[in-house]
């Protein structure tokens, strides 16, 4: 009868939706996130590392850099707690992104310094060459830095400002100097 066939079709459709949903869920559960590597630099040390894309990173003491074993997808993203200098290998199709608690820095091929120690009142990004896009405030505010500019964020006042520091002071730690 027509009613019996209609019930059979409804049951078949419900089973198809259920099986499809379970299959999609299981496929997503089995998808592996890229393996993350951690570079922790103890007190009174610095370390040079080369990321999988060829980007050179000099990491300051008491800093941690998290990065994937292999960059995949549309961007090359790392997470920094502390301070590091990045000499980014150019790749216009895959922007290089450094994330910290306070802001995100996007570069295509440039050299810049990020200082984002959680215990410090200020975090900053200083541009040595090229250009970078710095975003903050849940990525709703942004500015593009030019060479020899530094964006500084005061965590207590939640204020950002762009200054023109002495770059020798900004990079003194890379030469083992204290400022």
Annotated model-derived regions:
Residues 2-179:
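A residue-level detector for the "anchor" residue at the start of short, highly conserved motifs
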